[in-house]
């Protein structure tokens, strides 16, 4: 089962994206575990997930988070701002699964 970590400033807006992603996964018959956290939780959580997606509002943190993600062999990326703004859970889910299987 893929495990996806979403990270934003406080974990609030990404928690809504998580709900949309879980709904999309259910429709597609995919079992996933998705969690939203704030930036202060990234270091403690990344090791337990297959990939991490950052909210577009914290894309500036990508350079800070990449070294640990690479050390742990965890892909990390920034969510497309249009998909994030539209809460396109299906697209974000599919992008995260591609990231895991790349």
What kind of region is each of these model predictions?
Residues 38-42, 61:
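Short acidic active-site motifs
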Residues 42-44, 86:
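Generic structural signal for helix capping and beta-alpha/helix-loop junctions
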Residues 3, 75-102:
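Ser/Thr/Gly-rich flexible loops in soluble cytosolic domains mediating phosphotransfer, phosphorylation
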Residues 56-57:
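Short glycine-/small-residue-rich Rossmann-like dinucleotide-binding loops
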Residues 2-5, 9-11, 62-83:
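P-loop/Walker A phosphate-binding loop and immediately adjacent motor/lid segment at beta-alpha junctions
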Residues 19, 23, 67, 94, ...:
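Short, well-ordered alpha-helices that flank and scaffold nucleotide-derived cofactor binding pockets
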């Amino acid at each position: 089962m893929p495990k996806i970590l979403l990270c934003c400033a406080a974990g609030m807006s990404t928690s809504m994206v998580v709900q949309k992603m879980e709904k999309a996964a259910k429709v597609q018959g995919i079992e996933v575990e998705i969690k939203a956290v704030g930036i202060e939780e990234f270091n403690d959580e990344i090791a337990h997930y297959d990939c991490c997606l950052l909210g577009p509002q914290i894309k500036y943190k990508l350079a800070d988070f990449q070294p640990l993600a690479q050390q742990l062999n965890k892909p990390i990326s920034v969510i497309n701002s249009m998909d994030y703004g539209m809460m396109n859970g299906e697209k974000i889910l599919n992008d995260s699964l591609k990231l895991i299987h790349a």
